[in-house]
């Protein structure tokens, strides 16, 4: 199964999500740099919540300080638990570097944002030298690719299929989402549309961090002899026997305030000797 979702911004101002026939999820622009907040973002976020559609925010990267950009996103995203996407592509005379993208990712995570995706078209990845994208992958991000075969019509009609070249990996990452058109007709407007190979619950699971593994109970810090009245050391050997193995010999009798010193062996039961 493959599902579809639009990528929208103020260019689609006034779009009513309830009128979208093909949207199983929604991606909407929230911020750009430190200077811009999308005026339609909050309304779309609330519409998606009412419609129970997975909602993804995105930030358009600028050349400004990464921490300042992340703080700007955090102040406007509305719900930090929502999954987010970094839009990593050039604009005007600015061409972002991989280092700038990684810096924003780190700053966003430090702000508590659930940044999970990076939109990086293959052509721009090639333009910046076809780098290994392990730094993004290792930070928990998944790739969104783009390639437009052309044509007009609905998103399902334009989708080139699960085997399309837009699904091919690069930089040692493979796309979780594939933006396959910028001309899908839906809701009365031409829209960018993305595909996900899976179900809506599978997409939700992929965009949310896994539950943390259980943390082993720390090994207790040794207490003083006064605390437990047992010496903090032992002597002796481990010796094989027919029915028993000597495991631990504490110090000689009378050592410590409790007079420890007996030897315990493991055999058919605990045997004191």
Regions of interest found by a model, annotated:
Residues 1-18, 134-227:
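Functionally critical loop-and-helix segments that line ligand-binding/catalytic clefts
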Residues 57-59, 120, 208-212:
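Short C-terminal domain-edge/linker segments immediately following a structured domain
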Residues 1-118:
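Substrate-binding cleft of extracellular glycoside hydrolase catalytic domains
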Residues 35, 64, 125, 152, ...:
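Flexible, glycine-rich phosphate/dinucleotide-binding loops
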Residues 83-160, 164-165:
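Catalytic domains of cell-wall/extracellular-matrix polysaccharide-remodeling enzymes
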């Amino acid at each position: 199964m493959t599902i579809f979702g639009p990528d929208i911004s103020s260019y689609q101002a006034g779009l009513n999500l309830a009128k979208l026939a093909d949207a199983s999820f929604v991606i909407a622009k929230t911020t750009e740099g430190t200077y811009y907040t999308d005026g339609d973002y909050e309304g779309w976020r609330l519409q998606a919540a009412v419609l129970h559609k997975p909602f993804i925010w995105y930030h358009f990267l600028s050349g400004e300080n990464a921490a300042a950009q992340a703080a700007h996103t955090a102040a406007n995203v509305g719900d930090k638990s929502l999954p987010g996407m970094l839009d990593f592509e050039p604009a005007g005379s600015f061409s972002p570097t991989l280092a700038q993208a990684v810096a924003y990712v780190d700053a966003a995570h430090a702000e508590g944002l659930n940044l999970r995706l990076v939109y990086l078209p293959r052509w721009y990845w090639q333009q910046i030298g076809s780098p290994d994208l392990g730094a993004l992958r290792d930070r928990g991000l998944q790739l969104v690719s783009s390639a437009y075969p052309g044509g007009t019509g609905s998103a399902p009609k334009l989708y080139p299929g699960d085997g399309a070249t837009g699904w091919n990996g690069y930089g040692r990452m493979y796309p979780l989402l594939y933006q396959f058109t910028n001309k899908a007709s839906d809701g009365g407007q031409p829209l960018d549309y993305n595909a996900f190979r899976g179900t809506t619950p599978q997409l939700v699971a992929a965009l949310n961090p896994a539950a943390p593994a259980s943390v082993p109970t720390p090994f207790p810090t040794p207490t003083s002899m006064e605390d437990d009245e047992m010496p903090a050391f032992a002597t002796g050997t481990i010796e094989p026997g027919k029915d028993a193995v000597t495991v631990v010999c504490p110090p000689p009798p009378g050592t410590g305030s409790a007079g420890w010193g007996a030897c315990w062996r493991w055999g058919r039961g605990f045997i004191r000797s």
